[in-house]
Amino acid sequence: MTPNKPLFINMNKPEIIIRPARIEDAAAIARTVAEAIGDEVALNNYCGKDYLSVLTEISRAEGTQYSWQHAIVAECEGRVVGSVVGYDGAKLAELREGTFAVLRNRVGRVPDIADETEAGEHYLDSLSVAPQYQRLGIGSKLINAFCQRAFSEGAVHVGLIVDAENPNAERLYLSQGFTHVGERIFFDHKMHHLQRTKPR
């Protein structure tokens, strides 16, 4: 390299930082969870019409399914532009009770929903990237960061469920090393159960 020669900087490709979430990221995590649930009817049934506020409170709390403690975010120029949240499937009942405690307080009821995960897998619950930052590889980076953290904490399998009617999301997960292991019904939707196994 020629001394003092300036490096080429692609100003069209912003620098993306992948980092553990902080409590102040709770609102961004709430948007991720809302987008993952997707269906507004399901959101209202789950946590009421003021669902973003309720999900933000859940994300700010400790010991809930969507706690900031379980999330990893993508940051660009000081703004969170994507996040992934998940937890040890063996802790579903414990974390769901923490989540339901907020729902009882805010909404006055809790939903009757099936278990989305179980012991034996680290569950990737929700993933989203802001529309204007999609197709930059951020989703893949978040998935891999989540999997690496899970594997470093002793997980052998990372699991998730994806709507059978969302082939684009499914293709993303399959491209990142996930494979089909079964099907489940969740929020009245047929879901494909995928897992990625820790490399030997």
What are these regions (language model features)?
Residues 73, 79-88, 123, 128:
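Conserved beta-strand in the GNAT
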Residues 135-149, 171-175:
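Conserved acetyl-CoA-binding loop-helix of GNAT-fold acetyltransferases
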Residues 1-24, 44, 198-200:
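Conserved N-terminal entry element of GNAT/NAT acetyltransferase domains
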Residues 121-122, 150-161:
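Conserved GNAT acetyl-CoA-binding A-motif
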Residues 37-60, 69, 96, 103-106:
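Conserved GNAT-fold acetyl-CoA-binding loop/helix
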Residues 88-126:
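Conserved acyl-donor/pantetheine-binding loop and adjacent beta-alpha core of acyl/acetyltransferases
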Residues 60-73, 90-94, 123:
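A short helix-loop-beta-strand connector motif used in the catalytic cores of GNAT acetyltransferases and
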Residues 125-134, 160-169, 185-191, 196-197:
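Conserved beta-strand-loop-alpha-helix junction that forms the acyl-donor binding cleft
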